[in-house]
């Protein structure tokens, strides 16, 4: 995600968009815990966890945009409504509103035994751009597709033992499937969940899920190789504190890129340096927001 926002070329952008946002919804479903609380209580819990960071960091960037480009109501209207269109700087916060509605919908459908509705809702999300004249507010189109991915993630977790071969593929098989997956992704059109673009829908689902399962196996191989190292602990912290990275990465990249432009860093290495410096700063921010009283800003 951070590399995508730094920008490493059109091909890289196309490849990661095929799976990186689907992966966030899948992972959220994989980590989902069954709750006995009522829907109202759940809404309150999820609003604190997801909507407080959404409005804090989205609002902060709207204020900053007003300071830089002049006061305008458009960023605020989009923050409160069409949040996939234009939220300045930290546009990625759309995911928080999408995940909020995905989690509420999933819990409601499972609570009232309407799980079968997940499939038509996910299909509607894939077709929303073609069926509707305007994007749905609050990233609801992406939320509908995310509901299907969330379900797959949770079902994968429940069936982890029976899916052990799929979730623990050997390195050689992973590399072969990576080549196949890359070819399929490049064969398909451009994918962007935020913009409700899915090109060939069956191929979108195949590519997204294949990428995710390859990623799970590779992550286990990498973790085993890096066991008990600082890098392993750092990577775990990125996943644990991912909301900080979602909310802050574009803001950090914005200032780091502006600084590099000011000092005249060579173009050949600029993107790599921006990525490295941004990740260091983001790690510092994750420590700040998770270990101090500022944790309320990220819904803790």
What are these regions (language model features)?
Residues 1-300:
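Alpha-helical transmembrane segments and their immediate juxtamembrane cytosolic regions
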């Amino acid at each position: 995600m951070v590399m995508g926002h730094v920008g490493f070329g059109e091909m890289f952008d196309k490849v990661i968009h095929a799976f990186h946002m689907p992966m966030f919804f899948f992972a959220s479903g994989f980590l989902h815990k069954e709750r006995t609380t009522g829907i109202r209580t759940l809404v309150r819990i999820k609003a604190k966890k997801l909507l407080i960071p959404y409005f804090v960091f989205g609002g902060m960037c709207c204020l900053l945009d007003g300071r830089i480009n002049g006061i305008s109501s458009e960023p605020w209207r989009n923050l409160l409504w069409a949040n996939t269109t234009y939220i300045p700087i930290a546009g990625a916060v759309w995911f928080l509103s999408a995940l909020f509605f995905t989690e509420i919908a999933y819990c409601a459908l499972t609570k009232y035994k309407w799980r079968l509705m997940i499939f038509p809702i996910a299909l509607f999300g894939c077709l929303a751009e073609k069926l509707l004249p305007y994007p749905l507010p609050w990233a609801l189109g992406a939320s509908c597709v995310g509901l299907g991915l969330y379900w797959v993630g949770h079902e994968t977790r429940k069936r982890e033992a029976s899916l052990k071969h799929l979730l623990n593929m050997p390195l050689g098989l992973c590399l072969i499937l990576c080549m196949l997956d890359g070819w399929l992704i490049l064969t398909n059109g451009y994918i962007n969940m935020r913009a409700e673009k899915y090109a060939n829908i069956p191929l979108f689902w195949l590519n997204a899920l294949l990428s995710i399962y390859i990623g799970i196996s590779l992550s286990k191989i990498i973790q085993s190789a890096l066991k008990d190292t600082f890098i392993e602990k750092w990577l775990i912290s990125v996943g644990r504190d991912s909301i900080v990275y979602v909310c802050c990465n574009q803001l950090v990249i914005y200032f780091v890129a502006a600084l590099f432009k000011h000092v005249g860093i060579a173009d050949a290495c600029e993107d790599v340096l921006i990525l490295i410096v941004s990740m260091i700063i983001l790690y510092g921010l994750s420590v700040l927001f998770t270990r101090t009283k500022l944790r309320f800003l990220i819904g803790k």
